[in-house]
From Swiss-Prot:
Disulfide links within the chain: none
Superkingdom, natural source: Eukaryota
GO biological process: defense response to bacterium; defense response to fungus; killing of cells of another organism
Name this protein carries in UniProt: Maximins 11/H1
Entry-linked InterPro entries: Bombinin (IPR007962)
Protein's cellular compartments: Secreted
Keywords: Amidation, Amphibian defense peptide, Antibiotic, Antimicrobial, Cleavage on pair of basic residues, Cytolysis, Fungicide, Hemolysis, Secreted, Signal
UniProt keyword Signal, yes or no: yes
Record keyword tRNA processing present: no
GO CC, alphabetical: extracellular region
Principal subcellular localization: secreted
Chain positions with Leucine amide modification: 143
Annotated tissue distribution: Expressed by the skin glands.
Length: 144
């Protein structure tokens, strides 16, 4: 009788353990899906923000460029126009590539991924914004 009881309890414990392992695997796969969806949302928001900034800055730069085209240009004005054209090229190449593969992001949590995108934005936007500031400062100095 004791042997049957021990076998029955062992079987119940083994089946409960197997069910808990299966539930853990399902929970992990659901968590992976949620993390991937969050990552897509972060990328989408970043792309929309960058796209809006790019459009606004391009419009302002085109307006400034047309102002310079209509007036007489000195060597300094020509240099400013070259900088404006360089900024326009930088803005054209600023599009976010959707190349972040699952292998690259699988080991990161959401905060690390957000930090990576923030560092990338700072690395790209820093020089562009400083160049735009310098160009606008030069324009205001020349106009004033």
């Amino acid at each position: 009788m004791n042997f049957k009881y021990i076998v029955a309890v062992s079987f119940l414990i083994a089946s409960a353990y197997a069910r808990s392992e299966e539930n853990d695997e399902q929970s992990l796969s659901q968590r992976d899906v949620l993390e991937e969806e969050s990552l897509r949302e972060i990328r989408g928001i970043g792309t929309k923000i960058i796209g809006g900034l790019k459009t606004a800055v391009k419009g302002a730069l085109k307006e400034l460029a047309s102002t310079y085209v209509n007036g007489k240009r000195t060597a300094e004005d020509h240099e400013v126009m070259k900088r404006l054209e360089a900024v326009m090229r930088d803005l054209d190449s600023l599009d976010y590539p959707e190349e972040a593969s699952e292998r690259e992001t699988r080991g990161f949590n959401q905060e690390e991924i957000a930090n990576l995108f923030t560092k990338k934005e700072k690395r790209i936007l820093g020089p562009v914004i400083s160049t735009i500031g310098g160009v606008l400062g030069g324009l205001l100095k020349n106009l004033g």
